Regions:
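Short, contiguous, well-ordered secondary-structure segments
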Residues: 1-3, 18, 40, 44, ...
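N-terminal single-pass transmembrane signal-anchor helix
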Residues: 2-30, 34-35, 43-46
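Phenylalanine-focused residue identity feature
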Residues: 6-8, 51, 75-76, 90
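Conserved hydrophobic/amphipathic alpha-helical signal-anchor segments
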Residues: 25, 33-73
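Periplasmic/extracellular, small/polar-rich flexible segments of pilin-like filament-forming proteins
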Residues: 60-176
Length: 176
């Protein structure tokens, strides 16, 4: 009488588990980077929204806003009276010369360790040329360098528009 054995051997199961582990180890870092780039894009959209609203505020009041209060935008998770509200994973700074968004380590601590910042300048002079509404990304951390590089403008010569640790996102910056 012939005996039929159905099922998998231990070796076959171990091989499948090993393959799943290898695929996960390759895919997980890419997934994490995609999530971080998406967070940066969300901050970029929020930053541009606040910046445009601040420009309208300046035009109407001949002054720069000191907080979100008085602007024609609202963020449900932000304190409108704060000059540096936290929205999502970013702390926004509303200053007379610029509006910035720095990635913070968490709402509880809100520290600026090992991070990057997106900055919208009302006006900045670079190499004798004055630019208005200049958008840039600053990082001193190798860990976050790829975020700034992925957001930065590409020059016609294939280089990234940057100066030191500052990456220019605005298409107004002339590439070297």
């Amino acid at each position: 009488m012939k005996k039929n054995n159905f099922g998998f051997t231990l070796i076959e199961l171990l091989a499948v588990v090993l393959m799943i582990g290898i695929l996960t180890s390759v895919a997980l870092p890419q997934y994490r980077r995609s999530v971080q780039r998406a967070e940066a894009m969300e901050a970029l959209v929020n930053l541009k929204t606040i910046f445009d609203s601040a420009k309208r505020y300046r035009a109407a009041n001949s002054d720069t806003p000191g907080s979100l209060k008085g602007l024609d935008v609202q963020f449900f998770d932000a304190d409108p009276n704060s000059s540096d509200p936290i929205i999502g994973n970013f702390r926004y700074a509303i200053k007379p010369t610029h509006i910035g968004a720095c990635r913070v380590d968490g709402k509880a601590h809100s520290t600026y360790t090992d991070t990057y910042c997106l900055v919208m300048m009302y006006k900045e002079t670079i190499n004798g040329t004055t630019y208005r509404d200049l958008l840039k990304c600053n990082t001193g951390s190798e860990k976050w360098k790829y975020v700034c590089e992925s957001l930065a403008q590409s020059c016609t010569n294939g280089n990234t528009a940057k100066s030191g640790t500052t990456y220019y996102i605005s298409d107004k910056v002339v590439c070297d």
